[in-house]
A protein has these predicted regions:
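12-transmembrane solute porter fold
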Residues: 20-36, 41-42, 99, 269-439
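Hydrophobic transmembrane architecture of multi-pass small-molecule transporters
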Residues: 417-534
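Helix-to-loop junctions at the C-terminal end of transmembrane segments
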Residues: 71-87, 170, 330-347
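Interfacial helix-cap and linker-helix signal at transmembrane-aqueous boundaries
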Residues: 47-52, 78-81, 112, 165-174, ...
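Hydrophobic transmembrane-helix bundles of small-molecule transporters
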Residues: 173-285, 290
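Extracytoplasmic
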Residues: 17-76, 126-127, 298-302
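Short hydrophobic/small-residue motifs within alpha-helical transmembrane segments
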Residues: 65-70, 156-157, 324-325, 421
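Helix-loop-helix hairpins in multi-pass membrane proteins, especially solute transporters
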Residues: 76-77, 81-214
Length: 534
């Protein structure tokens, strides 16, 4: 888009828009798009009460949106060359707005999941269009370690702030108003695009030939099958239910078909060479371990704050401000040390897992009935800080893959796990462990309580039952925090046992001219075949 050593410009803007203002308008568009989605998981409880859907239904729709976002990365450069910027933003804004209206008015679960999936895909498309437009403004050297710091600053900040906005609307009026607000914001964005953007093409046009659409759909089915098993497993009693067995079979079959097709078709959605590259499974494993260690933030923290400490939704969501500060500090630290000073991947990951271990150790030693709200600030801050470092370091490491195809496929696989699958897998493992351990602890705590025990004789049964459950919950959380702390310590030792001096020195994004040439060479046989048939 921009030639080296030339002044940065965004040619799709009309001439009356000041040059200094153009990147900030694009960032505004990114923020609006990142706030949007099919469903808003912060309002899950309110949606369950209003729509009579299961909690699992809402979670399935929310994570389906993240799967749609991840799958877009497999074709991100192709759509950049195929569609004009103005058309992209208008189309994506319109689709996401319609998805919001449908999501707030339907109780049909397949429709809700499908709409959320589509909304996630177009949300990522609009985000990539905007971010790629201002990449040279953010980092003139095209340093992806710098660029990814910006990406996670925007994405994670939007997650925290959208949760706050959702609860604000839910308390003030109804969760529906969050959808109305997002639709209005998207309409404003579309109006600005129509007024400020020229209908021009800033990239050489390349048609969408040679894209494995069937492969993309099957990878999506595989991911959604994993989500279904993890989210609905406890509800349906795992593989005793035909629903879970069917989803498992569907996931295994589509995964096998994808790998089989990738062995002989010309342009598979994910090449086998990408999956064989050592950096891809390593990054996926790191993200799964990190998400397992951070799973208590999704389960234990809410159980502690709601069930034990008695916080309402406003008090719980206000802690997102602490996570927001942790995001900013984590991004600044990563930018200064990793992007600027080029600290090694090993050092950054050791720091990140140390922060996560501090989070686990804090709750292991401090968890109690009477924790003040201020006592939760430190662990929430350090877990967010640690996660940001892991995410940026892992994503940057994928630049070792060749551009453009292997890189974008590696990013797709990493995002498929980091955004959706790893978190759900981690939460499922910890939730299952919590159920088993809590049942055991409740049995141990209540084994001496009977109708002739003087200590419990005059205590009402329901009060006694509630006390046992609360105590069993605290004992269970403490025990699992301890287990996870040992896993975190083992991860730190494994990362530090062998010195690695690999640093993010050659993480430069190629120019779009170079990428377009590679894509043109890739699709030229397909174009020749189409011309012959015509």
């Amino acid at each position: 888009m921009h030639a080296p050593n030339q002044k940065f410009e965004i040619p799709q803007f009309r001439s009356f828009v000041p040059e200094w203002l153009r990147p900030w308008i694009v960032i505004l568009f990114v923020i609006i798009v990142q706030f949007s989605g099919g469903v808003y998981l912060a309002a899950t409880s309110e949606m369950v009460g209003t729509t009579q859907l299961l909690n699992e239904d809402i979670m399935m729709a929310g994570y389906a949106s993240l799967v749609g976002m991840a799958l877009f990365f497999g074709m991100m450069f192709r759509v950049k060359f195929a569609v004009k910027p103005r058309t992209t933003l208008l189309m994506c804004g319109g689709v996401i707005a319609v998805a919001n209206l449908v999501a707030m008015n339907t109780t049909n679960v397949p429709l809700l999941v499908g709409v959320s999936f589509v909304a996630g895909f177009f949300r990522m498309w609009a985000t990539f269009e905007c971010n790629s437009t201002i990449q040279l403004w953010l980092t003139p050297k095209r340093d992806l370690s710098v660029f990814f710091c910006y990406v996670y600053l925007i994405v994670n900040s939007a997650i925290q702030l959208s949760g706050i906005a959702t609860i604000f609307f839910s308390v003030w009026a109804s969760w529906h108003f969050m959808h109305y607000f997002i639709v209005a914001a998207l309409l404003v964005m579309m109006l600005l695009v129509m007024l400020l953007y020229k209908d021009i093409r800033v990239m050489p046009h390349l048609p969408l030939y040679g894209i494995d659409w069937l492969g993309m759909i099957m990878w999506g089915i595989t991911a959604l099958s994993v989500l279904f098993v993890c989210l609905y497993g406890e509800h349906y009693d795992w593989w005793y239910a035909w629903q879970i067995r069917t989803a498992t079979l569907c996931g295994v079959v589509t995964l096998a078909l994808n790998l089989w097709r990738a062995s002989f078709i010309r342009h598979p959605y994910i090449m086998l060479d990408t999956l064989k590259s050592p950096i891809v499974p390593i990054t996926i494993a790191i993200m799964i371990i990190a998400d397992v260690l951070l799973a208590p933030s999704h389960i234990f923290e809410h159980a502690l704050m709601e069930g034990v400490l008695g916080y309402d939704a406003e008090n719980i969501i206000s802690l997102n401000w602490v996570a927001f500060v942790g995001t900013i500090v984590g991004v600044l630290f990563t930018w200064l040390t990793f992007a600027r000073r080029k600290w090694s991947y090993q050092r950054m990951l050791v720091i990140a897992f140390t922060a996560i271990a501090l989070y686990l150790a804090y709750f292991y030693f401090v968890i109690d009935y009477n924790l003040p709200k201020e006592a939760l600030y430190f662990p929430i801050f350090v877990r967010t800080f640690g996660y940001i470092i892991v995410a940026v370091a892992v994503l940057t490491s994928l630049t070792r893959l060749s551009f453009p195809f292997h890189f974008m496929q590696g990013v797709m696989m990493q995002n498929l796990f980091s955004a959706s699958l790893a978190g759900v897998i981690g939460t499922t493992i910890v939730a299952r462990a919590m159920k088993v351990v809590m049942t055991r602890n409740a049995a141990w705590l209540s084994e001496g309580m009977d109708s002739i025990s003087l200590s419990t004789l005059r205590t009402p049964f329901m009060a006694l039952y509630g006390e046992v459950q609360v105590q069993a919950l605290l004992e269970t959380m403490k025990e699992i925090y301890g287990w996870l702390l040992w896993v975190a310590i083992a991860a730190i030792i494994a990362l530090g046992v062998r010195y690695s001096g690999i640093r993010p020195r050659h993480v430069i994004h190629p120019t779009f001219r170079v990428i377009s040439k590679a894509v043109r060479v890739s699709i030229s046989p397909v174009q020749r075949l189409i011309r012959r048939r015509a």
